[in-house]
Amino acid sequence: GANSRTGFYLKKYNDIDLAGSSVGGHGNLNVIRFAEILLIYAEATFELQGKKLTQTQIDYSINRLRDRVNMHRMNLDELSAWGMDLETELRRERRIELAGEGTRYADVMRWREGELRFGRAITGPSLKVCMNDLGANPYPDTGVDEFGDVIYEKSTAEGGARYFDATKHYLWPVPNPERQKNPLLGQNPGWEK
């Protein structure tokens, strides 16, 4: 629908020729793009080679994506000179290229960064909540962090329900119907109750 928790919408895959039309939807769904294949190649090669890539491998993968949009090419010598970490840059590249495509959760779980990424408040754009004529927040249910960003869901430390338990949340529970079919299957740690 035409809803957004933040007020921002994703432009990816929208056909401008169909704007304002109630017909003409797409019959094809993008499941995987060549860009994702190149990113998978870069990450897998990096991991298999002991956290290293050659400039040739970066040119074959990351720089093909960057060349497509006339972006500055990734260069190992520059990364080193600027004190930048290759692993962080590869992950950032993936986060940007695949934004809005539904891969972020799986990436964070694979990288074991759940505590870092999911253990904090969800915030929106910096709106600097406007005060009404009486000097009060007209939206009392809306929390605002120290930067003026609207808080949609608070972390446990702030009294909300959001938290990430590393002993439990890296695995999903085994569904009860599957466990009933095979009582020897057991349950993943933390999901026993």
Please annotate each region the language model reported.
Residues 1-193:
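Acidic/polar-rich alpha-helix caps and helix-coil junctions
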